[in-house]
Amino acid sequence: MQRFLTFGVAAAWLVGCAAGVDRAEPVAIPFAPGACEVGVYQSADSFVTITRRGEGMRYTFNDGRTGNIGDGAQVECGEGVVQVDKSHIWQKRAMRVTNTEFESLGVRLAGQLIEPAEAGPNTPLVVLAHGSEELGWIEAVSYPYQFAGRGVSVFVYDKRGTGRSEGSYSQNFPQLADDLVAASFEAKRLAADRFGSFGLFGFSQGGWIVPLAAERAGADYIGIGYGLVVDILEEDASQVELELREAGYGDDVIAKAKEMTDVTARLAISGYSDGLEDLSALQTKYGDEDWFSLVRGGFSGIILGMSADDLGQNGIPMFDRLNIDWSIKPMDVLRDVNVPQLWVLAQNDREAPVSKTLEQLLALRGEGKDLKIFMFPDTDHGMWEYQQGSDGSRILTRVTDRYYDLLADWAGASLQPPYAMSEVK
């Protein structure tokens, strides 16, 4: 299935929105500060989304610039409008918003369908699977509004145990895939006769979940942002290696760390019964070396900081409640996905190191899978650009330019590279 056309849906949507704007004689709209309203606010050729941020609000421009609403912010809220740079008034765009509840595996989940006002039979519809954060996504993140602002209908829902949804928070991927399938059925029901193609997008941990759900959900395509094609154990080991290499350690220390992560993996999948003696031995062997205290990974750092007795008796409650299924093998899952896939990688991702994932994706393409792979340089997890200090710490600055365009264009079957500085792999 070819998903390249000549003009991106994101660009086409902005041109269409700008068509009725009289640039020669702009209408002056008085601005009075007021309470922020979640949604999309449009200028002639750009837009900004307003979402909730804890007790406050956050803005995100269509090019990825973002910040908190507050004193001195670039964006101020008014009734049905926002003021940008204290001089430009952008009006709220009309959207059809439908709140709903649906059931998955006996649990009530909260969802929201956001559609452009003129959504019709050719409008793409996507459902979003978010990452591991214990945060409901309804009205809280920019992604749904970035899609809707580009003419794509989008269904977002709060994962079980988060936001408005019931149930217990989980990182059991098959269970979360079942929830995604249920969300897909609900999205299609609500948008009946007002959508064309249907896709799933997963971000971070959602990149493990979307492929599990793709066939049952009836997806025409899938998109993954900063996900992994390694399992949870491999992710942990990759993170540990990256941490130590960034700290300046070489292959000798990496080999020692590999001994450690092999043992922590055995402990994790066995419920802390297989490897306790080996853990004690390695803690004694390497515990006084400088690199040992730097190990974090996904879970290895916590295990290494515990005694074997404590681990065997008490486990790790913060992990044990997650109901993790350690058996999922992403390559096996992806071999069963028979629709086009988009993978967008952050080159300098510390949470999801990309080297192995890229290698695996290229192997899948070699097996005949329809994959488009884009990598954005100088970005970290979440497609964030950053400033890095001399100590290696990073301050996240903005979502990289054209990332959101790429996602929406994929949904609209209208990819048109290049996307800023991204590399097509």
Where are these regions (language model features)?
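The serine-hydrolase catalytic nucleophile loop
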Residues: G131-Y145, K159, S355
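Conserved alpha/beta-hydrolase
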Residues: F147-R164
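Short beta-strand element of the alpha/beta-hydrolase
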Residues: P121-G131
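Short beta-strand/loop motif that positions the catalytic acidic residue
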Residues: V337, W343-L345, D349
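Accessory cap/linker subdomain of secreted extracellular hydrolases
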Residues: G225-V333
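Alpha/beta-hydrolase active-site loop
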Residues: S170-L190
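N-terminal cap/lid segment of alpha/beta-hydrolase-fold proteins
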Residues: I29, Q83-A119
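Conserved alpha/beta-hydrolase "acid-adjacent" motif
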Residues: R350-K356
